[in-house]
């Protein structure tokens, strides 16, 4: 947003600018900052000043003072500036309005034109056109900001304002130090994509080749173990699928044989138990037979055992 203000010279010889109004175009919604008080305008018709906003934000400026003695003693191309304390600073909010091409002010002038910049304070008043009571808005003039940047401010002259971005203010003539990088920047020198792809493809092919070799070796081992599936038949045209199929059949046959053998083994164990019981019974009967024979001899009876050949 761009606005225009009028100035008035006080009795103390300090050049001050009263609260101004916003120049509006065809947009009726543009809101004025404050009413213009009757005062003499700038004697120089080339004097221009603008409100500059970034990203549609609010304009903030600080109350400063330009002494008459400093203005009389300065040469063309320089400007002496002193600042008020932070407690005397004021804020003013500016509402953005639409401007036509006729209302715009050309801010890019020659080196002889005087430009004005409003510097921000720490707070912004609520509402459009809200100002702090009893404070006035002052303007900073400059003719050559590049020349002022290289000069140090004499002691006791207060703050030093630079005509650039409102956030960039150098105090006491000291230069602002730039924070170093946390880590040095190293540009990436990546190899061409084709070389990277070829390397990845070659590595993938090598892995696949090793995997195929392992599978082939395992199939050869199976062909040696499975009956009727020797290397000769494999070389004569036996496919890998046929070898694997025979391996599956052979494994199924082995499982069935193992199950059958386990059942037969359980039957043998049962027969062994039965045989042990029968053997014990035979031993008991033999002992009883011997006792009976002894009793018969004791009573004078002779026992004759006849073997029937029939």
Curated annotation (Swiss-Prot):
As for subcellular location, the record says: Nucleus
Source organism's superkingdom?
Answer: Eukaryota
Q: What start and end residues bound the annotated signal peptide? A: none
Sorted alphabetically, the keyword list is: DNA-binding, Isopeptide bond, Nucleus, Transcription, Transcription regulation, Ubl conjugation
Disordered, as annotated region = 1-26, 171-209
Question: An example Gene Ontology cellular component term from the record?
Answer: nucleus
Classification via Pfam families: HLH
Q: Does the keyword Nucleus apply?
A: yes
A GO molecular function assigned to this protein is:
DNA-binding transcription factor activity, RNA polymerase II-specific
Q: What does this protein do?
A: Transcription factor that binds to a symmetrical DNA sequence (E-boxes) (5'-CACGTG-3') that is found in a variety of viral and cellular promoters. Regulates the expression of the surfactant protein-A (SP-A) gene.
- In its UniProt entry, what is this protein called? Upstream stimulatory factor 1
| Record organism | Oryctolagus cuniculus (Rabbit)
Q: Which gene encodes it?
A: USF1
């Amino acid at each position: 947003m761009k606005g225009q203000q009028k100035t008035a010279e006080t009795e103390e010889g300090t050049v001050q600018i009263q609260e101004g109004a916003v120049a509006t175009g065809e947009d009726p919604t543009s809101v004025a900052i404050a009413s213009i008080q009757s005062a003499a305008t700038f004697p120089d018709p080339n004097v221009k000043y603008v409100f500059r906003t970034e990203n549609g934000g609010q304009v903030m400026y600080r109350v400063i003072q330009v002494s008459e003695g400093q203005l009389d003693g300065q040469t063309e191309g320089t400007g002496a500036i002193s600042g008020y304390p932070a407690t005397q600073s004021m804020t003013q909010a500016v509402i953005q309005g639409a401007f036509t091409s006729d209302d715009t002010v050309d801010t890019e002038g020659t080196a002889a034109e005087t430009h004005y910049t409003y510097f921000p304070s720490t707070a912004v008043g609520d509402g459009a056109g809200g100002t702090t009571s009893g404070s006035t808005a002052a303007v900073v003039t400059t003719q050559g900001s590049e020349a002022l940047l290289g000069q140090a401010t004499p002691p006791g002259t207060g703050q030093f304002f630079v005509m650039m971005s409102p956030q960039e203010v150098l105090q006491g003539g000291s230069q602002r130090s730039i924070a170093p990088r946390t880590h040095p920047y190293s540009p990436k020198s990546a190899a061409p994509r084709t070389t990277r792809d070829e390397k990845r493809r070659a590595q993938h092919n090598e892995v696949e080749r090793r995997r195929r070799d392992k599978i082939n070796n395992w199939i050869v081992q199976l062909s040696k173990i499975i009956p009727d599936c020797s290397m000769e038949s494999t070389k004569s045209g036996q496919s890998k699928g046929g070898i694997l199929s025979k391996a599956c059949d052979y494994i199924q046959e082995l499982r069935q044989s193992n199950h059958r053998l386990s059942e037969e083994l359980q039957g043998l164990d049962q027969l062994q138990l039965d045989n042990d019981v029968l053997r014990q019974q035979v031993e008991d009967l033999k002992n009883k037979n011997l006792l009976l024979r002894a009793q018969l001899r004791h009573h004078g009876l002779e026992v004759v055992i006849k073997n029937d050949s029939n």
